[in-house]
Amino acid sequence: RLVILTKERGKITVFANGARKAVSQLRAASQSFVMGTFTVFPGRDSYTLVKAEVREYFSGLPLDMEKLCYASYVCEFMSYYTREGCYCVNELNLLYVTLKALEQGTVDNQLIRYAFEVRLMDIEGQGIHAYTCVRCNKKELKYFNAKAGGLLCEACGKELKLTRTVSETLIYTLQYIQSADLTKLYAFQLSEEAMAELKYVADRFREAYIDREFKSLEILSSL
């Protein structure tokens, strides 16, 4: 049984009969982290894989335990937001550039992870409000509050509990992640201090709006 994210029908369950056999033409397509063109036959509750043309294996991911764990988390997080019957071209493109960035290894894995989280949640309409105050729409931003939905101006921030002052770097970083062309999403680096700030904001926001434990995240935390 395979789970495939498609641009036309969203996340679908597919059975690849005989894929485990060494001589099966579907064997390569049944591996993890494979992208390509899949021909499926629809059934009552699932699909049957008939043919597959693999275009990308991301073969570098299984060779590195840390990359493998991050890639697994990316797929699990994507699975949480996707379902069958949806047009998922933005999600599929984001997944591709993210796995490619992890495989290439030129950008910090942790930065890729959090940029992916922020961008996907924004695509799904659950993103951090990062351009104006989430309460009054002022453009002068100073605080972050997860339960409020994002960034706040000084006046609104002082009225709420559990707010945290944010830097101009953090504000720009969030805006860049949400608006950058996907081909340039991972074309930046952050200082250690800025990375810690992004991590805090992304973690608090995810915890506030996603009530699910990710198994791959538990493994990542143990590395």
Feature roles, as predicted:
Residues 1, 5-223:
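Non-catalytic alpha-helical scaffolds and adjoining flexible linkers that form interface surfaces
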